[in-house]
Swiss-Prot record:
<dbReference type="GO" id="GO:0046353">
    <property type="term" value="F:aminoglycoside 3-N-acetyltransferase activity"/>
</dbReference>
<dbReference type="InterPro" id="IPR028345">
    <property type="entry name" value="Antibiotic_NAT-like"/>
</dbReference>
<protein>
    <recommendedName>
        <fullName>Aminoglycoside N(3)-acetyltransferase IX</fullName>
        <ecNumber>2.3.1.81</ecNumber>
    </recommendedName>
</protein>
<dbReference type="InterPro" id="IPR003679">
    <property type="entry name" value="Amioglycoside_AcTrfase"/>
</dbReference>
<keyword id="KW-0046">Antibiotic resistance</keyword>
<keyword id="KW-0012">Acyltransferase</keyword>
<comment type="function">
    <text>Resistance to neomycin.</text>
</comment>
<dbReference type="GO" id="GO:0046677">
    <property type="term" value="P:response to antibiotic"/>
</dbReference>
<dbReference type="Pfam" id="PF02522">
    <property type="entry name" value="Antibiotic_NAT"/>
</dbReference>
<comment type="similarity">
    <text>Belongs to the antibiotic N-acetyltransferase family.</text>
</comment>
<keyword id="KW-0808">Transferase</keyword>
Length: 281
């Protein structure tokens, strides 16, 4: 949207103090460990952009709180490059840069905040190339440490540690289907029809570029056959809406954006039960 459209959408500039007030009204509080997903255009004209949003979040969670975002890697080799002609594969392998937590851009599909937060002084980004997260705050080092190479959405991952920290999930204008924590439920759900992918990406090992194979749930095409979900509704949105109907989560407005705040533990428990009840066959 153009600036005036955004200003009209939000009824004037959305300032740091306004965001702080709205976040507090939604239920975010001092000491929270929170993963957040943001669609900035839904909020309106944010005066100061990503810096303002991060600043307001830090104001609310305080010195004891920790912020977390899903990053990924925007310029990762495609999963299917092994289907390319051999000389193309060889050229890619020879020169594709390794994933570097300090330099590699976050996936553009995740919005502007996952690119901004890792640049914040003191932020830490996890080591996994395809499923990296970043965190800022006193719990950041523990959340990001030794992100497992295989099954990066499963046990002993940043998502699992978020739950262990009694963390929360915040959607700032982002659609309900962007809730990355639901991949953790997919990874741990006991359903035989679960889909996995195996892929190769370059990483840094002792400063040297090394190609490594990884295994994960298929988070791109879908970890399960979700065909029972109503046509036109994303599976994660269906889970989240059922969750809200069950009384899990709070809804409010941040700027002009419909926003949601959930406790991570109940989200995980509800989602894993939902998946196993509806998809186990």
């Amino acid at each position: 949207m153009e600036e005036m459209s955004l200003l009209n959408h939000s009824g004037g500039p959305v300032t740091r103090s306004r965001i702080k007030h709205d976040l507090a009204d939604l239920g975010l509080k001092d000491g929270d460990v929170v993963i957040f997903h943001t669609r900035m255009s839904a909020i309106g004209y944010v005066a100061g952009g990503t810096q303002t949003i991060i600043g307001a979040l830090l104001d609310v969670v305080g010195a004891r709180g920790t912020l977390m975002v899903p990053c990924g890697w925007n310029n990762a080799p495609p999963y299917d490059f092994l289907d390319w002609p051999r000389d193309w594969q060889d050229a890619l392998r020879a020169e594709h840069p390794a994933y570097d937590p300090d330099l590699s851009e976050a996936d553009y599909n995740n919005g502007r905040l996952p690119e901004a937060l890792p640049r914040w002084p003191g932020a830490i980004r996890s080591r996994h190339p395809d499923a990296s997260f970043a965190a800022l705050g006193p719990a950041a080092a523990e959340l990001m440490a030794e992100h497992p190479w295989d099954h990066p959405h499963g046990p002993d991952t940043p998502l699992a540690r978020l739950i262990a920290h009694s963390g929360r999930v915040l959607l700032l204008g982002a659609p309900l289907d962007t809730m990355t924590l639901l991949h953790h439920a997919e990874a741990l759900a006991d359903v035989r029809s679960k889909r996995f992918v195996t892929y190769e990406q370059p990483i840094l090992v002792n400063g040297q570029r090394v190609w490594r194979q990884f295994r994960d749930i298929d988070s791109e095409e879908g970890a399960f056959d979700y065909s029972t979900v109503r046509r036109g509704v994303e599976p994660f949105e269906a889970i989240a809406r059922d969750m809200l109907s069950a009384g899990i989560g709070r809804q409010g407005r941040v700027g002009a954006a419909d926003s949601y705040l959930f406790d991570a533990g109940p989200v995980f428990n509800f989602a894993i039960n939902w998946i196993e009840a509806k998809l186990k066959r």
